[in-house]
């Protein structure tokens, strides 16, 4: 009875739910057990309102928290539940062969650009299905997914963010620019940057963020800057692509050389003269990979 608002030694058992799907399961199990037991059950059942980690009781919790238990928000439990659902859905769509192949394809070995990245073995189409099913996910959940060690979780987060962008561009772009740490492989960049930052810049005149990212020491942020211009190119705006290509003429990283070459090719599809002029002026300084 020294545990603040908790019931102390007067413990009781209970089974609780946090949504209607859980409630149906609880009611079913409760009824089955009661029928088997043959007598009314003393177990409580109802919606879960709050909870705390029970193991804290054995870790001098009251010494550290003299006012008693600090109950955790139920939103924490909901977040964990949906995160778990996404993980299960991704794993259900995984392929053992791809789980072996993808780490090699994305260069996850020591000293390589994707060092330490882990793969469940899920294809992009399968990941899109999971993202679509959770397109109403909170930013808290997207953040948690972006912090995952699993590549497909981070991709799923970015695909959900693209859906969020369609409803609230300002909020989605702000989130994207402050969570780029999780956008750390070329496919994660290429499948998100044009459709979030790139699309946003098409509708706004200030493109200075591209040049800020281009000066970043983080190669993935540099690639975000270049690949974001894909949407500008598709809308007839070539200036930023050309200027960024000039900035990266001396880049040593093959992923940046490829990104610049890709965007220049896209410009050439729409304005061959502009591309030829750029090549005639800069081809001597351009890396072979870019050419």
Regions found by a protein language model. Name each.
Residues 1-87, 133:
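Flexible coil/turn and secondary-structure edge motifs
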Residues 84-291:
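Alpha-helical scaffold domains
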């Amino acid at each position: 009875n020294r545990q603040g608002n908790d019931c102390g030694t007067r413990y009781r058992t209970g089974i609780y739910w946090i949504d209607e799907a859980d409630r149906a399961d609880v009611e079913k199990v409760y009824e089955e057990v009661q029928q088997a037991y043959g007598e009314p059950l003393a177990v409580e059942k109802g919606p879960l309102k709050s909870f705390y980690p029970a193991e804290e009781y054995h870790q001098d919790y009251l010494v550290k928290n003299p006012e008693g238990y600090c109950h955790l928000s139920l939103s924490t439990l909901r977040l964990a539940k949906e995160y778990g659902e996404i993980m299960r859905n991704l794993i259900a769509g995984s392929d053992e062969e791809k789980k072996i192949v993808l780490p090699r394809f994305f260069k996850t070995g020591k000293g390589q650009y994707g060092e330490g990245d882990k793969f469940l073995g899920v294809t992009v189409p399968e990941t899109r299905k999971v993202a679509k099913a959770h397109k109403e996910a909170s930013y808290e959940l997207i953040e948690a997914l972006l912090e995952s060690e699993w590549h497909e979780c981070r991709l799923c987060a970015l695909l959900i963010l693209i859906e969020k962008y369609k409803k609230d561009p300002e909020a989605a772009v702000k989130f994207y620019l402050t969570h780029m740490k999780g956008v750390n492989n070329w496919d994660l960049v290429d499948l998100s940057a044009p459709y979030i930052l790139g699309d946003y810049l098409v509708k706004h005149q200030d493109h200075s963020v591209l040049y800020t990212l281009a000066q970043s020491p983080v190669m993935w942020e540099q690639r975000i800057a270049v690949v974001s211009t894909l949407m500008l190119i598709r809308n007839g705006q070539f200036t930023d692509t050309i200027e960024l290509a000039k900035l990266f003429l001396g880049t040593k990283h093959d992923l940046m050389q490829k990104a610049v070459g890709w965007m220049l090719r896209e410009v050439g599809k729409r304005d061959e003269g502009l591309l030829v002029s750029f090549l005639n002026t800069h081809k001597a300084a351009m890396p072979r990979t870019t050419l």
